[in-house]
Regions:
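Alpha-helical transmembrane segments of integral membrane proteins
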Residues: 2-5, 21, 93-129, 144, ...
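Hydrophobic alpha-helical transmembrane segments of membrane transport/permease proteins
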Residues: 17-68, 159-181
Length: 325
């Protein structure tokens, strides 16, 4: 199968997976206690009012028909109006997506840099490498919410080093672009560190394992035979071969990153997509739930397809839609 055909097949499978997940979520939302009519009219509305809302919003149609109509409107850019915020869902999600991407990209880049460095350093240690890798595995097992609470209490509330809530200080609005950017970066330190710590430990473990495999290869033995220092071999030759494989792993971590972002945003009152989802769940805001989850699922599937493509590029024997995770 050609590369283009494999790519088209992977995209088609990704679209089918997205539609299946959206259909399941739509059915769950429609069958939730209270229903959309109660969410729109209010819990204390009379039955007559709820019935009128049901007719006005065509909520009495079959669920399958409602889903097809929802997907058709979504494809045209009409994601509906939030029941709770009374604003277009697309604009609301776009507004909250920027802080979430800032949090995720900052955490992912920090985790890759720190995890790669720690993993390579552990691989270069003849006797202490296994201990370092075990410590990284232990850190990876720590709950994100618990780590966040420790950092908030210690570095935030007790020592006062960093702010513990929000995206920025309202007093910095008129301070200029540079000062505002620094203020956002300062507020992002604890949320980014909380989200990055677990992923850095994961990348360190993966890097250590892959680096140890690389160090058994012939080119490493040849370099040692030529008298090249172990540090140069690890940070020069081995690091170059491990790097592309980490890119595949990073793309496949996007789903876990979103899950952690929801917890971190809730903990630090970070005004992102995760906090919006929490509010939508509490307030039974069905349009926001469907739109936000749909976007997250689409991004996760896209990153998975991209990981398959990168994996196939690294190893041409693997087709993009059949690449291993």
């Amino acid at each position: 199968m050609s590369a283009v055909a494999s790519l088209l097949r992977a995209l088609a499978l990704g679209l089918l997976a997205w539609l299946a997940i959206q259909a399941l979520l739509f059915a769950l939302v429609q069958s939730a206690p209270g229903g959309a009519a109660a969410a729109l009219a209010g819990d204390f509305a009379t039955r007559e009012t709820q019935a009128e809302v049901t007719r006005s919003f065509a909520l009495d149609r079959p669920v399958a028909e409602q889903f097809v109509s929802f997907i058709a409107r979504m494809a045209q850019g009409d994601w509906g109006v939030s029941y709770y915020f009374r604003r277009p869902v697309a604009g609301l999600i776009a507004e909250r997506l920027v802080p979430t991407l800032l949090l995720m990209l900052g955490s992912l880049s920090s985790a890759i840099v720190a995890g790669r460095a720690l993993g390579l350093w552990a691989a270069a240690q003849q006797h202490r490498g296994a201990v370092i890798a075990a410590a990284a595995s232990a850190v990876y097992a720590l709950p994100v919410f618990w780590v966040g609470q420790l950092l908030m209490l210690g570095a935030g509330l007790e020592l006062g080093w960093f702010p513990v809530s929000g995206l920025s200080d309202p007093r910095q609005v008129d301070a200029g672009a540079g000062a505002a950017a620094l203020d956002i970066a300062w507020h992002a330190v604890l949320p980014v560190t909380t989200l990055a710590l677990q992923h850095a430990a994961f990348f360190a473990t993966v890097t250590h394992a892959k680096a140890r495999l690389e160090m058994d290869q012939g080119y490493v033995r040849a370099a040692r035979a030529r008298g090249i220092a172990e540090r140069t071999i690890v940070w020069g030759h081995v690091a170059r071969n491990v790097g592309p494989q980490l890119a595949v792993v990073a793309l496949n971590r996007l789903g876990m990153l979103f899950t952690g972002a929801v917890l971190v945003e809730t903990l630090y009152a970070w005004p992102g997509l995760g906090r919006l989802l929490s509010a939508a769940i509490l307030n039974r805001d069905h349009p926001v739930l469907l739109g936000a989850f749909g976007l997250i699922v689409a991004m996760v599937i896209t990153s998975s397809v991209a990981a398959d493509i990168v994996q196939a590029w690294l190893d041409p024997r693997i087709e993009p839609d059949r690449a291993p995770p």
